[in-house]
Amino acid sequence: MSHYAPFIKPYIEYNQFGWGPCDVSDMEVPYQPFCKSDRLGKISDWMLPVQDKKYTNKYASTFGSNNSQYAYFHEDDDATFHLVDGGNPRALKPYQRNRYRPNQRNNVRLHGRYVRGNAMIGVGQGGIGGSGGAGAGNKYGKGRDMRRGYAGRRFMRNAPVRLRESSVLVRSDWVSIEEIDFPRLLKLSLPNIKDGIDIVTCGALEYYDKQCDRINVKNERPLQKVDRIINVPGTIDDPVIRRLSKTMGNVFATDDIIATLMCCTRSNYSWDIVIEKLGTKVFLDKRDNAQFDLLTVNETALEPPQDSEGSINSPQSLSLEATLINHNFSQQVLKIGDQEPKHKFEEPNPFEEPGVELASVAYRYKQWQLGDDVVLIARCKHNGVIKSPSGELQFVSIKALNEWDSKAANSVEWRQKLDSQRGAVLASELRNNACKLAKWTVEAVLAGSDQLKLGYVSRVNRNDHLRHVILGLQQFKPQEFATQINLNMDNAWGVLRCLVDIVLKQPDGKYLIMKDPNKPMIRLYDIPENAFDSDGNEDEETSEDRPFLKSMAN
């Protein structure tokens, strides 16, 4: 038995005072790298064949990720087995060099500007990419925002795509008096303003053609060009306002100027209004040769028109097209003819010229009491008149909405939805033209119109901006329509009274209210008397106004 190795009994530690293993030293114990933050479920690395694509390292160990102890290796039993593809082979796209190289952080070209590191050359603070340059998207300057365009567009969703131009160039000699942002204006209120009192009524109105109410998409009617003129002079150029200003009132304006101020919180484009203060009298007027009377198109849309100036869909071209459509439509839906009856007011049209055919329009010069010391006199207008079933005369304000390109405007197709879903079409227009519709409503309320007629006019072809068709009409009561579009007249009167009070506190002179082109605020400037004179010479209209203004000051 001596040639066998001796049997040595192993040492077994017996726990005499408790249950379970005894204390054993950690010597020669196998060690597996681990991390306390590792998720439980290590076995899923080799049990589940599907990987988590969103969190690829969800179950990977921080310190032992390179350890292949638990890795699964697949071994093919039959190396000669091949799977035959029976589908149609897809043509592979050619390799595009430098198609996506997010790791090149230096010398990245952004929309015609160069970026070096985290500094952008050619773009100031607040420009493309913000103040952090290309690396402003996240911590490392790449990732989700890099895939969207290197410029951190996640933080620019509400920023204007293109900086808008100001309606008038602010000169160095203009003095800024006040800056009022829209949130402050929205908190204003002037309740219990009574309806205006008629002082003078002028002009003549033609009757509305009720057959136009039958127009629909299937029975459309071509829009005709009406060779008529509507004179829209400014406040100071109005002879009736000049006459009334000598005996009554201390604030004078027109309905479109008042509507612009009342609805300023809904506007995006820049506009300006000239103010003449003479003692206790204030004249709100518009500049000569300005685009104040032109209608805007898709001003409040998410993507307003941004085509170049020469295009038919540029903001300037669309504005002129909408103005002409509105003028022609307001006359075509009336009963035109020498034999047709007309409703004449007390005085004739004050802007009548010999040899010129005037459009159907009547003017009401009305007076409002805006407090103890503010009396407003404004010129308002009607476009037509209609007889109700009871035989009562009702005055009508006629306006037209125009469709130019539903795909480019991202709006509803009128020819498909106007007859069946007219509410959806109107909702789309309220979203894209909120400011324009609000101003039309304010003008109808100020004039005391009984009805507001809205026409839907579309292009015959989206590429032809000269031919149009009428697809339908819709009528509203101005007060009810103001409630539907969330137009608060108490706030509108409060905004007007606030601006008038600011001007009344200033010394006599010339001022200008301007909507900031890129910020939701309005600015008040003190400007020289000859601020808008070309080459230092006054034009004929301005020279005629000087004696009147001097007489008012005296």
Curated annotation (Swiss-Prot):
Give any Pfam family that matches: eIF-3_zeta
Region (Disordered) location: 530-554
- GO cellular component terms, semicolon-separated: eukaryotic 43S preinitiation complex; eukaryotic 48S preinitiation complex; eukaryotic translation initiation factor 3 complex
Region RNA gate, as annotated, extends over: 291-305
Name its cellular compartments.
Cytoplasm
GO molecular function annotation: mRNA cap binding; translation initiation factor activity
Q: Which UniProt keywords apply?
A: Cytoplasm, Initiation factor, Protein biosynthesis, RNA-binding
| Function per UniProt | mRNA cap-binding component of the eukaryotic translation initiation factor 3 (eIF-3) complex, which is involved in protein synthesis of a specialized repertoire of mRNAs and, together with other initiation factors, stimulates binding of mRNA and methionyl-tRNAi to the 40S ribosome. The eIF-3 complex specifically targets and initiates translation of a subset of mRNAs involved in cell proliferation. In the eIF-3 complex, eif3d specifically recognizes and binds the 7-methylguanosine cap of a subset of mRNAs.
State the family it belongs to. Belongs to the eIF-3 subunit D family.
Protein name as catalogued? Eukaryotic translation initiation factor 3 subunit D-2
Q: Which organism is it from?
A: Drosophila mojavensis
Q: Mind giving the lineage of the organism this protein is from?
A: Eukaryota, Metazoa, Ecdysozoa, Arthropoda, Hexapoda
